[in-house]
A protein has these predicted regions:
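Short amphipathic alpha-helical coupling elements at transmembrane boundaries
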Residues: 1-8, 90-96, 159-173, 211-214, ...
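Loop-to-transmembrane helix boundary motifs in multi-pass membrane proteins
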Residues: 12, 63-71, 165-186, 203, ...
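Helix-loop-helix junctions that connect adjacent transmembrane segments
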Residues: 49-68, 97-227
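Alpha-helical transmembrane segments of multipass membrane proteins
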Residues: 78-79, 107, 190-191, 230, ...
């Protein structure tokens, strides 16, 4: 990982800064995705006729008390990681395939409804980043900064080096291959979404892809997309919680954190204490 490289090449002080920067980065990613998952989960429950109190589906900053679904999914994924790397990796692979199929279905339905008028004006807020009267930054550069958020996961792959049979080959294929594949998927999904509906409409929804399909008259497909998001979106949490806990683990082993946190469970072969600590930290941010 970037931490290990910094520790080896630049020294302990730089590695300490890089390590905590990665921890902050991963914490923000996991908490954000957990809140996004909560939006799909709550929407799915509402479709089933089940409503949750506003106080339990939003944090204090959004007028609630705690985002209970976001906190629950964080601890659920952490529990899976504590059960063992092999088990979590197998489930992750299955869910990723399911997620790719769902995105393929979305593109197949939304792309035929493509309306070029939705792309006009092509850059409605201009190229440079600018602050709007509502306090929200807009523009191509502001959007680019947000899109980089989607590429954080490629660094997380390198945190699995010690648990990989052939890291020299496998990590290279994993990082480059997934970056190419994900970029193509991102472009296709974004093109299909913006072409099918104005971004000003679905951009405000907590479940944008499902909303687009419903508006196109594909209610059942929207339900499937929502269900798949609920089932498969935790793969992002899985990857980043794994990466974050392993960074904590290595920092602990290197003496930059209490060494007791680097203890590995004899039965599962996983750092249970540091994984639980990571989950508590992320759940506090998400909730």
């Amino acid at each position: 990982s970037a931490y290990t490289y910094s520790y080896t090449a630049l020294g302990e002080s730089i590695a300490w800064v890089v390590g905590w920067s990665l921890v902050l980065e991963y914490s923000l990613v996991v908490s954000t995705v957990a809140v996004g998952w909560s939006g799909y989960f709550v929407g799915f429950l509402q479709w089933l006729g089940v409503g949750l109190p506003q106080a339990l589906i939003a944090g204090p900053h959004a007028g609630g008390i705690v985002n209970l679904p976001a906190v629950a999914i964080t601890f659920l994924v952490a529990g899976l990681l504590m059960a063992g790397t092999k088990e979590s990796a197998t489930l992750n692979a299955v869910l990723v395939v399911l997620k790719i199929i769902a995105l393929g279905v979305f593109v197949a339905i939304a792309l035929p409804a493509f309306n070029s008028a939705n792309l006009q004006p092509f850059m409605p807020y201009g190229f440079s980043k600018a602050m709007g009267p509502d306090g929200i930054e807009r523009g191509v550069m502001a959007a680019a900064a947000i899109i980089f958020f989607a590429f954080y996961g490629f660094d997380a792959i390198s945190t699995a080096a010690e648990e990989t049979k052939n890291p020299g080959r496998d990590l290279s294929i994993g990082i480059v291959g997934s970056m190419i594949g994900c970029t193509l998927i991102y472009v296709l999904v974004a093109l299909a979404a913006v072409g099918a509906m104005s971004f000003t409409v679905f951009g405000k929804s907590p479940e944008p892809l499902a909303l687009i399909l419903r508006e196109l008259g594909h209610g059942k497909a929207a339900l499937v997309i929502g269900a798949v998001a609920i089932i498969a979106l935790p793969t992002v949490l899985l990857a980043f919680l794994y990466g974050q806990s392993r960074i904590f683990f290595v920092m602990s082993r290197d003496g930059l954190l209490p060494r007791g946190l680097s203890k590995v469970n004899a039965r599962t072969g996983t750092p249970v204490a540091i994984t639980l600590f990571t989950a508590v930290l992320v759940a506090a941010l998400a909730g």
